[in-house]
């Protein structure tokens, strides 16, 4: 009887950590060249209340739909990136081909790469987001391959 009560307490006593504004994640950008500089600008943030995560909202109206930016919105943000707040920036070290931007709040980011060589990169987007249910603070971190094509709402885009 004692063993059953102890096991029951362990199972029922475990509590999930609710999503909160303190949650952070990372964006990993691969297939870069040494000397490239990766800069991330947050354009969508996560919203919370006392019960946890409530959804996403656009920062400064950069996008109409926070979870479905259009290709034109990405182009417009890239054109005005100089006016946006830098969330993180990191230079690719000699001998490396990737960078990881850590400690970023949950949300979506415009990622720009300034080339240290002759490579030209197009603007990219990445997200740090909760699971669909958002019942705990488990995050999916952003990942971008800088030399891959991608689509936004079925419109072809190119990473470089």
Model-inferred region functions:
Residues 28-34:
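Structural motif
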Residues 14-21, 93, 108, 115-158:
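Structured interaction patches on ligand/partner-binding surfaces of diverse proteins
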Residues 29, 101-102:
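Hydrophobic core positions of the immunoglobulin-like beta-sandwich fold
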Residues 1-13:
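Sec-dependent N-terminal signal peptides of Gram-positive bacterial secreted proteins and lipoproteins
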Residues 97, 104-113:
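A short tyrosine-centered beta-strand micro-motif
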Residues 23-27:
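Structural beta-strand segments of beta-rich domains
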Residues 51-99:
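Short, acidic Ser/Thr/Gly-rich low-complexity loop/linker segments typical of extracellular
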Residues 37-39:
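Beta-strand signatures of extracellular beta-sandwich domains
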């Amino acid at each position: 009887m004692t063993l059953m009560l102890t096991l029951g307490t362990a199972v029922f006593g475990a509590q999930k950590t609710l999503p909160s504004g303190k949650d952070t994640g990372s964006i990993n950008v691969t297939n870069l060249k040494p000397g490239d500089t990766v800069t991330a600008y947050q354009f969508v943030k996560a919203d919370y209340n006392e019960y946890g995560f409530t959804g996403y909202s656009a920062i400064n109206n950069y996008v109409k739909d926070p979870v479905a930016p259009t290709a034109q919105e990405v182009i417009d943000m890239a054109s005005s990136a100089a006016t946006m707040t830098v969330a993180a920036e990191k230079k690719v070290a000699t001998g490396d081909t990737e960078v990881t931007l850590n400690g970023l709040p949950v949300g979506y980011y415009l990622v720009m790469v300034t080339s240290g060589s002759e490579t030209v990169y197009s603007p990219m987007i990445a997200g740090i987001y909760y699971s669909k249910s958002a019942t705990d603070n488990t995050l999916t971190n952003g990942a971008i391959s800088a030399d891959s094509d991608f689509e936004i709402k079925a419109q072809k885009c190119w990473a470089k």
